[in-house]
UniProtKB/Swiss-Prot annotation:
GO terms for biological process: translation. It comes from the Bacteria. PANTHER family: 50S RIBOSOMAL PROTEIN L21 (PTHR21349), LARGE RIBOSOMAL SUBUNIT PROTEIN BL21M (PTHR21349:SF0). Part of the 50S ribosomal subunit. Contacts protein L20. SUPFAM superfamilies: L21p-like. NCBIfam families: L21. GO terms for cellular component: cytoplasm; ribonucleoprotein complex; ribosome. This protein binds to 23S rRNA in the presence of protein L20. GO terms for molecular function: rRNA binding; structural constituent of ribosome. It holds the Pfam family Ribosomal_L21p. This is Large ribosomal subunit protein bL21.
């Protein structure tokens, strides 16, 4: 059984036991998380009806808070001597999916 959940502006296809990296969620490692915005559930039959999905919830456990890979930004303007370097590492949360309840 799998479900498609939306968190952090992105959609993820998850099943029980999966570990997914999502945008940063508040909470300590080991705490419980529930994903409310559910888009699709597949079990014996596929459910995409909004009324039926309101009863479904996906729960997970926070595994750890991490950072993504370093992204380097370099702005440059020709002939003026202007250049600017900047780096960024996105904060991520690893979540282990513990249950999909219908």
């Amino acid at each position: 059984m799998y479900a498609i959940v939306k968190t952090g502006g992105k959609q993820y296809k998850v099943a029980v036991g999966d570990v997914v990296e999502v945008e940063k969620l508040e909470g300590e490692p080991g705490s419980e998380v529930t994903f409310p915005a559910l888009l699709l559930v597949d079990g014996s039959d596929v459910t995409a009806d909004a009324d039926a999905l309101a009863k479904v919830s996906v729960t997970g456990k926070l595994v750890e808070q991490t950072k993504g890979p370093k992204i380097r930004i370099h702005k440059f303007k020709n002939k003026t001597g202007y250049h600017k370097r900047q780096g960024h590492r996105q904060k991520l949360t690893r979540v282990e999916v513990t249950g999909i309840t219908k």
